[in-house]
């Protein structure tokens, strides 16, 4: 019975993460689009999500520092989860008192604070899920429930927010998001602290924490030693993400500009699109297991080029439901397919001694690429027609192919040289 309640708790915590994530990346940008703000401003607002990219910086601090009193009463992970969620709720209360459209500077600051505590919560919950499991099978189940919860949170934050905004208004949408977030502390108090085989070495003072930050330094050095072409990989990831991040960031301004209704966007783009994304992600994982990571990455990248291409076709044709459905199908399938494969590729780059930190570094850079590309895309979209913008997006994204081919050649050369030695 407890196991079932524990999994429900994991699902609810995942839902809260997905809801707050979607608040920054979809709900507020959509409201600003409705208020006729330009694409460069909407793109700039996405910079408020920077904490999602930089969470690797303070994750060692969360791992090492024990919160006085709460750390003893609740345990290390639960105390951090509770504190991060309380501050997240306070930030959302502050956000609720203001209209996002009235003062964009204040809106960006509040969203940045929300992103900080939401990403802090994610750090803690990721560690909790890993430490709480005792086998690979249980780990798979726990992360599956967490993923389902995250997607449900995104669905509530998109389809739910759109319909609620029509019926009740945007203020009620944010009240609803706050109400769901307030469930988080209750869930944390109901679940148990992980039982570790070895004693955790933590401190409740700031002395000696500098030593722990050596983990990040060693991880980066190890990363560089393992991958002599690290700069090429960084450039590759940036270009690889361009075919997905830019269309995703500019999708709502485009759809509204083409006169698609809120109902059509909610049902086709968010609800139907989410299901297609799950299908694409599943098939991407299967392909990587069947034919290997390198070939899968290439296939995923090429398929992903169809996404901005379809947006260009939609922008050229204009309002057309059939073309809209085809575009959403291709865009979400490609996003799920390539997203899963690039995550597997990140994992393959990690040294076994520093898997957690190195994967966090890779994930942070991936998030950073998405935010930078979204911001640059917003600036470019203001000065180009939609058709020309997405054509340039397609051509720019194609540059990943020669970069990836160079990485592949260097990898083969390194492997052959190692065998000779």
Curated annotation (Swiss-Prot):
Keywords: Cell inner membrane, Cell membrane, Membrane, Transmembrane, Transmembrane helix, Transport. This is Putative transporter AmpG 3. It is a multi-pass membrane protein. SUPFAM superfamilies: MFS general substrate transporter. The keyword Transmembrane applies. Gene3D superfamilies: MFS general substrate transporter like domains. The lineage of its organism: Bacteria, Pseudomonadati, Pseudomonadota, Alphaproteobacteria, Rickettsiales. InterPro entries: AmpG_permease/AT-1 (IPR004752), MFS (IPR011701), MFS_dom (IPR020846), MFS_trans_sf (IPR036259). It is found in: Cell inner membrane. One of its GO terms (molecular function) is transmembrane transporter activity. Belongs to the major facilitator superfamily. Its main location: membrane. The chain crosses the membrane at residues 6-26, 41-61, 80-100, 104-124, 139-159, 166-186, 230-250, 274-294, 297-317, 324-344, 360-380, 388-408. One of its GO terms (cellular component) is plasma membrane.
């Amino acid at each position: 019975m407890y196991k079932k309640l524990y999994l429900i708790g994991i699902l609810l915590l995942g839902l809260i993460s997905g809801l707050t994530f979607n608040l920054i990346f979809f709900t507020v940008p959509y409201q600003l689009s409705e208020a006729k703000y330009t694409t460069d401003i909407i793109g700039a607002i996405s910079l408020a999500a920077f904490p999602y990219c930089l969470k690797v910086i303070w994750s060692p601090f969360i791992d090492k520092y024990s919160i006085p009193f709460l750390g003893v009463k609740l345990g290390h992970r639960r105390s951090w989860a509770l504190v991060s969620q309380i501050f997240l709720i306070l930030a959302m209360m502050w956000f609720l008192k203001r209209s996002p459209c009235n003062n964009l500077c204040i809106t960006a600051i509040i969203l940045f604070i929300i992103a900080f505590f939401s990403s802090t919560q994610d750090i803690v919950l990721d560690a909790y899920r890993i430490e709480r499991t005792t086998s690979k099978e249980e780990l798979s189940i726990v992360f599956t429930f967490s993923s389902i919860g995250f997607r449900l949170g995104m669905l509530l934050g998109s389809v739910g927010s759109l319909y609620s905004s029509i019926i009740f208004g945007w203020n009620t949408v944010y009240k609803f998001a706050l109400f769901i977030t307030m469930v988080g502390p209750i869930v944390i108090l109901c679940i148990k602290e992980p039982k570790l085989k070895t004693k955790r070495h933590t401190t409740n003072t700031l002395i000696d924490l500098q030593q722990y930050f050596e983990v990040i330094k060693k991880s980066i050095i190890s990363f560089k030693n393992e991958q002599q072409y690290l700069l090429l990989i960084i450039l590759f990831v940036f270009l690889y993400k361009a075919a997905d991040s830019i269309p995703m960031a500019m999708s709502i301004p485009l759809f509204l500009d083409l006169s698609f209704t809120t109902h059509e966007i909610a049902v086709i783009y968010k609800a139907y699109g989410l299901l297609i994304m799950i299908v694409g992600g599943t098939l991407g994982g299967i392909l990587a297991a069947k034919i290997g990571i390198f070939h899968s990455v290439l296939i995923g990248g090429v398929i992903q080029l169809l996404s901005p291409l379809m947006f260009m076709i939609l922008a050229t044709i204009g309002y057309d439901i059939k073309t809209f459905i085809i575009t959403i199908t291709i865009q979400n399938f490609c996003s799920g397919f390539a997203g899963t494969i690039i995550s597997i590729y990140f994992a393959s780059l990690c040294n076994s001694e520093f898997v957690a930190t190195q994967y966090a570094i890779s994930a942070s850079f991936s998030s950073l690429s998405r935010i930078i590309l979204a911001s640059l895309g917003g600036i470019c979209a203001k000065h180009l027609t939609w058709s020309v913008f997405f054509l340039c997006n397609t051509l720019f994204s194609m540059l990943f192919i020669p970069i990836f081919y160079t990485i592949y050649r260097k990898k083969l050369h390194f492997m052959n040289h190692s065998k000779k030695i």
